[in-house]
Amino acid sequence: MLTKIGFGLDPALLRAVIKTESDFRQHAVSHKGAVGLMQLTPATSARLRVNDAYDSIQNIRGGAKQLRHLLTLYQGDLPLALAAYNAGVHRVKGGKVPRIRETRSYVKKVLRYYEAFRSHPKPSSKHEKK
């Protein structure tokens, strides 16, 4: 499923972001009001035209679209794109991950999960088309 809706992103990367953002809980809500698997804020959901951020497909599609945009903006620099996904583009300056403890921890955690998921890929579902 992630391959089909992930805007060309590695499914292991999307799983790593989802694991970090919501621990795979579809109805997760943050203290800042971000919701769903990829923790989209209401403003981000509106900008990405996600009508129901609790819907797994819409949420992943929106989060993947945002992450793809950030990777393009930061010329493929994954740590910077992840920092912007977490803290906002306005906080990622000078080509460096901002000195925000939560953001630095977030980037490290996603990268750690990404490596783990790449090393041990999830077997495809029998319902997923190859």
Enumerate the language-model features and the residues they cover.
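Catalytic glycan-binding domains that act on GlcNAc-containing polysaccharides
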Residues: 1-130
